[in-house]
Amino acid sequence: MYSSIGFAAQKVQISLSENVKKDLALTTDTESLDEVIIEANNERLNVRSSQMSANTLSTTTIKKIPVVLGEVDVIKAITLLPGVTSAGEGASGFNVRGGAADQNLILLDEATLYNSSHLFGFFSVFNPDAIKDLTLYKGGIPARYGGRVSSVLDIYQKDGNKREYHASGGIGLVASRLLLEGPIKKNVASFLVGGRSSYAHLFLPLFDNDNVAYFYDLNAKLSYNLNDNNRLFLSGYFGRDVFEISDSFANSFGNTTLNLRWNHLFSNKLFSNLSLIYSDYYYGLELKFVEFDFDSGIRNFNLKYDFTHYISNNIDLRYGINSIYYKFNPGDVTPTTEDSGINPFKLTDKYAWENAAYVDTEIELSDRISIHAGLRLSTFNRLGQDELFLYEDDNPIIYNESLDIYQKAKPIDTVSFGRSETIKSFANLEPRFAISYLLNEDSSLKASYNRMAQYIHLISNTTSPTPFDIYAPSGKYIEPQLADQVALGYFRNFKNYSFEVETFYKEVKNRLDYVDDADLIANDAVEQILLNGEARAYGLEVLFKKNTGKFQGWVAYTLSKSEQRTPGRTPTESGINNGEWYKSPWDKTHDISITGQYEFTNKWS
């Protein structure tokens, strides 16, 4: 007798004298029932787990959040969480616990995105229809993540439906989207493809406006089950923004990613994931009135091999390696006409190689105590380039004591390195630890510590990333940023509610600061305008959520302070602001967010 819930039973005669394997297709046998909604109880798991300072949002939750201009927005959704702020409308990126936007690691299917916004911050680069879920780590960051000192935003795309074809989309005031998914071979292979485009610029000529501003992006994913133990995924993203002001200038910028991923199941206790990843961020500017193009960007190739080992019911072990090769293009100028008057020139390309190995373990020591311990070893090699400037005493900035100002030092020589030669190397141990103590079935206390290293830097003297900014690697004159963070929290669940309160303290060493009148654009010696400083942030975060029922939502409150200082390098130097602490551009003492949704019927809310 073969039977399964929802299918009619079948009787089949078999011989007991020989080995037999039969695959049967059962016919459906359904009855109409009232709708039942099953939701994962993340709040209860959150009380028991040692993980803290992390928030997971499903696309269902994100789509329930009230929207502006008819567009569901992932980045605006996470800025409603405690500890997360935005520099404001029209500002790209987001800030976490007083950190800068470039200190956030943003991953889409494991590939790094260097700019998370369209139209200078009014929209995010994430198509909500293509997203499966996301997790934001503000602290207690697992050892499998590295490369940034503030946070990790880990986003995965849907795999595509392997049984049925589906289409979804939406039409907004300024943009529309469409997503298609379905089986290539039923129950074996599937596809997902989605696109978005804005069109508000099409109406500007009606108002005698020659300006142009629009974006478009494309998400795609292929999934293939080789067999019960092996799965392949190929996913990608391509996005572009275009902005033109009449006959003055035009610029375009955007991300490109590609990821080939292989999942392998060795046994029911050991799982692996091998990924080959490509990421690219491009910025192009055409200055029509002076007739030249300026292009810059950053590109990386990433190899990841991760293992998850379920040793016992109480012990999980994760370990793996990661290797990233970077190419930095600070910019090159190309005249667009013979009469331009601009000579072509190219800033020196830079190269680097970042490697890491990690181990993470989660252990339930008893019914009340759980720990999460990890260690990450990261290395960074600044590779060869043409014409590296040399300075007297290796000091690219000199201090004029009589004028009390910093000035550029004149290079005394240049030296060239081969592409595979190492100019300077760094290595850092990054320990991670978290512990949870269960007070009772509905409440717990948690504490965490993590150290993070960041080897690439956004060279920008604005409060938020802009397309004009460039990335630079650590090297002979630029030190990697190092952050230490501790947090303590109390977590409590009620019948339909959950409550979280956390306090944190974070210090960042080697935070870059800029001398007065720093020139960042088309600068082939940015070390002449940079000073090493430090930053700190501390605060209190509260999150109160209504998780079930017709009315759902949350209230988030953050009380925090974010400061930085750049002291003099010697007793005779004044530094910046006389070496005293001052508010960082991302300081926001009080921040409160309230979001809610009431469901009148299954179709109206």
Question: Model segments located where?
Answer:
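Short, acidic, small-residue-rich periplasmic hinge/interaction motif at the N-terminus
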Residues: 3-8, 15-71, 75-76, 101, ...
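A beta-strand signature from Gram-negative outer-membrane beta-barrel systems
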Residues: 22-24, 80-81, 125-168, 177-179
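Short acidic/polar hinge/loop motifs at secondary-structure boundaries
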Residues: 64-66, 111-138, 208-213
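Extracytoplasmic beta-strand/coil segments of soluble accessory domains associated
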Residues: 66-115, 132
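Outer-membrane beta-barrel signature, preferentially recognizing the C-terminal barrel domain
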Residues: 79, 251-253, 257, 261-265, ...
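Transmembrane beta-barrel wall of Gram-negative outer-membrane proteins
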Residues: 172-199, 208-242, 250-274, 278, ...
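Surface-exposed extracellular loop regions of Gram-negative outer-membrane beta-barrel proteins
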Residues: 282, 327-339, 343, 381, ...
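Gram-negative outer-membrane beta-barrel transporters
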Residues: 505-507, 526-605
